[in-house]
Amino acid sequence: MAKQITSNCNFIFGASDIKSLPNESAPEIAFAGRSNVGKSSLINLLINSKKAARVSSKPGCTRQINFYSMYNDKFRLVDLPGYGYSHAGKEEIIQYLNLIEYYLIQRRNLRRVFVLIDSKVGLKEIDKDFIYWLICNNINFNVVLTKIDKVSQKSLGAVIEDIQRWINNENVSIHQMSIRVKHKITKVRDEFFKFTR
């Protein structure tokens, strides 16, 4: 099954401006979060690949919206540029932030946004700002806690409680992920992909 998933995923396009966004012919789920929170690693884990999505140790390397086609374009995974730290210049940052905003608000085939939060640092102000923006624009989202293997269960529980209290919406699910904790990946993958049906 894992090999089948990998063979049915292809990188199709990296959009650096509004005009270059691909057509809206397939349902999409998008992954957002602070720079270096693990979006590309999560996508690789979901599709059982080590290199489909480029992973960098330097924050702010993804500067375009990357689209991955699943099962002959039955649906797509979308890797959004990280918010926060970036090596890009001010004008370039403004350009891709405008691109992200346009994509999230205008994309008719967008089914769900998964907001990734680093469990080591918890919910930061910049995460709150982004989530508040999603809420104000009526954009459906869930939360994904990354790097859960690097914190204690007590600390993880405190982070989850803090997020639940701040969002205060029982319809927003909180998922737990780590590239080193793979035994629950099938269940999580099914949970993510159900939004594309």
UniProtKB/Swiss-Prot annotation:
Domain EngB-type G positions: 25-197
Signal peptide: none
Binding site for GTP: 33-40, 60-64, 79-82, 146-149, 177-179
Cited Pfam families: MMR_HSR1
Keywords: Cell cycle, Cell division, GTP-binding, Magnesium, Metal-binding, Nucleotide-binding, Septation
A molecular function GO annotation: GTP binding
Binding site for Mg(2+): S40, T62
Cofactor: Mg(2+)
Function: Necessary for normal cell division and for the maintenance of normal septation.
Protein name (database record): Probable GTP-binding protein EngB
Name of the gene encoding the protein in the UniProt record: engB
